[in-house]
Amino acid sequence: MNPTYDEILKANSLRGNEIKKTPLIHSPTFSDLTNSEVYLKAEFRQKTGSFKIRGAYYKIKSLSEEDKKFGVVAASAGNHAQGVALASSLENISCTIVMPKNASPAKVAATRGYGAKVILEGINYDESYSKAKEIAKETGATIVQAFDDPQIIAAQGVIGLEILEDLPDVEEIYLPIGGGGLAAGTVIAIKEKNPNVKVIGVQSKSFPSMYESVKQNVRTLTGGDRTIADGISVKMPGEITFDIIKNMIDEIVLVDDDEITKAMFLLMERM
């Protein structure tokens, strides 16, 4: 079942003090380069360093007391892993995270630092997720999906509410796409409040799964071995996220690793 705008409002009301409302930061450099006014949504200011804590916290907070007894399991290249690990720690439940073997050592260490048991399996999200499903079947743990879950999507969609609150006259919003949870939730929130805002997804050329799926109007398996944008190295988009994005997003563009790297350095040097 696809998440609704009301579910996004509910996620916003239940986020508590652990989830920050992050600011929009004006970027003079990118504004000059694009001849427009560019703002960056500072999700790196969340405790785990990314927006992923939003969905993980709301999902785990919503589990029944019975489900919490069996703990949770998740697959992630790093950001979702840290979000699930921290949220589990806050709720005092056991947590197992399956991460790709090529995951960032810093992200692996951070995930363990939040108290999770980490298993390294596979070379991308999809292979790690297969292992997570095995663990869930064996232990009864709840799988906290990285993107294809109505509650996860709804909580990520709160970002859209915050953008419109801080910048009501926004004209275009660019969102990274891996599995599509952030883009799906945000586009629901944005289009409900202002359907005239153009929402554009951005995906790695190495893992163009959502781009190809929307293009062919069917979920499509794609992807190489790796990309510098390891957090969006997803070979197959989710069922729910695909259905939302194909019907609501305005456009998806692809960028290669060279373009991503140059943008990263430019951000660090001249944001």
Where would I find each of the regions flagged by the language model?
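PLP-dependent amino-acid enzyme catalytic core
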Residues: 1-271
